C-alpha cells in the first residue's frame, strides 16, 4: 500500500467517525441535570397541616412512615400498658394532696382544687402538648404526634385510653365533693377538667391542632 493510499484510508475513516459522532444522542450532562433540578418543584412534607388557619388537622403518614413506626416498639407510649402504669397515677394524686396539705392556711377545699389543677395541667403537657419521642429509633416517624396519639398505635377506646380519661373525671368528682360543692371552685374545676383533660382525649380532637398566634407555635415537623 502506497503512502497516498494510506492517507486516503485514514481520511475516510476520520470522516466516517465524525459522522457517527454527530448521529449519536448526547448523554445527559451536568448542565442538563442541573437545569432539570431547577425546574423540579421542592418536595413538600406530607405531614404539614392542611391549612394555615387556627384550627388544622395533621394528615396521615405515608407508607414509609408507617413502616418506620412499626419497625420497633414505641417506647414512648408502650409503658402505658405496662404493669403498674395505672397505679402511678393514683400515687401521684396522693403525693400531690399530701404536698399541698403541708402549706399552712390551705384549706381542704383548696388543697383538692390545687391537686386537681396540678394533675390536669401536668397530664395535658405530657399527653397533648409535647410531640415526638425522646428516643431516636424510628427515623422521626412520630415527630408530629403527641403521646396520646401514639398510645396503642392510635387505636381508640382501648383500656388504657379509657383509664386515662376516667382518672381526671374521678378526681374532679372527688375535688367537688371535698370542696363542699362551692360554686366558684366547682366552675373552675369543671372548666379545667373538661377542656384540659377530657376534650383533648375525645376522637373528635384526634390529630387536631389549635394554633393561637403569639401563644402556640406550629406543630413540630422534623
From Swiss-Prot:
It is a multi-pass membrane protein. Residues 12-23 have a biased composition (Polar residues). It comes from the Eukaryota. The keyword DNA damage does not apply. Residues 1-57 are annotated as: Disordered. The modification Phosphoserine is found at residues 29, 32, 56. Residues 107-109, 184 are extracellular. Coiled coil: none annotated. The keyword Lipid biosynthesis does not apply. One of its GO terms (cellular component) is serine palmitoyltransferase complex. Residues 1-85, 131-162, 206-222 are cytoplasmic. Keywords: Endocytosis, Endoplasmic reticulum, Lipid metabolism, Membrane, Phosphoprotein, Sphingolipid metabolism, Transmembrane, Transmembrane helix. Phosphorylated in case of disruption of sphingolipid synthesis. Phosphorylation regulates inhibitory activity of serine palmitoyltransferases (LCB1 and LCB2). The chain crosses the membrane at residues 86-106, 110-130, 163-183, 185-205. Component of the SPOTS complex, at least composed of LCB1/2 (LCB1 and/or LCB2), ORM1/2 (ORM1 and/or ORM2), SAC1 and TSC3. This is Protein ORM1. It comes from Saccharomyces cerevisiae (strain ATCC 204508 / S288c) (Baker's yeast). The lineage of its organism: Eukaryota, Fungi, Dikarya, Ascomycota, Saccharomycotina.
Amino acid at each position: 500500500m502506497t503512502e497516498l493510499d494510506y492517507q486516503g484510508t485514514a481520511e475516510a475513516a476520520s470522516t466516517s467517525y465524525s459522522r457517527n459522532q454527530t448521529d449519536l444522542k448526547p448523554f445527559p450532562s451536568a448542565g442538563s441535570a442541573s437545569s432539570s433540578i431547577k425546574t423540579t418543584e421542592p418536595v413538600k412534607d406530607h405531614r404539614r397541616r392542611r391549612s394555615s388557619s387556627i384550627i388544622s388537622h395533621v394528615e396521615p403518614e405515608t407508607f414509609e412512615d408507617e413502616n418506620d413506626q412499626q419497625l420497633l416498639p414505641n417506647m414512648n407510649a408502650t409503658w402505658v400498658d405496662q404493669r403498674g402504669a395505672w397505679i402511678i397515677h393514683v400515687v401521684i394524686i396522693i403525693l400531690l394532696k399530701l404536698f399541698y396539705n403541708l402549706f399552712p392556711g390551705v384549706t381542704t377545699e383548696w388543697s383538692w382544687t390545687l391537686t386537681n389543677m396540678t394533675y390536669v395541667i401536668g397530664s395535658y403537657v405530657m399527653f397533648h402538648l409535647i410531640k415526638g419521642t425522646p428516643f431516636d429509633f424510628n427515623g422521626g416517624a412520630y415527630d408530629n404526634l403527641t403521646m396520646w396519639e401514639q398510645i396503642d398505635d392510635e387505636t381508640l377506646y382501648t383500656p388504657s385510653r379509657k383509664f386515662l380519661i376516667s382518672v381526671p373525671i374521678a378526681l374532679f368528682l372527688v375535688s367537688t365533693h371535698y370542696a363542699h360543692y362551692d360554686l366558684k371552685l366547682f366552675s373552675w374545676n369543671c372548666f379545667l377538667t373538661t377542656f384540659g383533660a377530657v376534650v383533648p382525649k375525645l376522637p373528635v380532637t384526634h390529630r387536631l391542632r389549635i394554633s393561637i398566634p403569639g401563644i402556640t407555635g406550629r406543630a413540630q415537623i422534623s
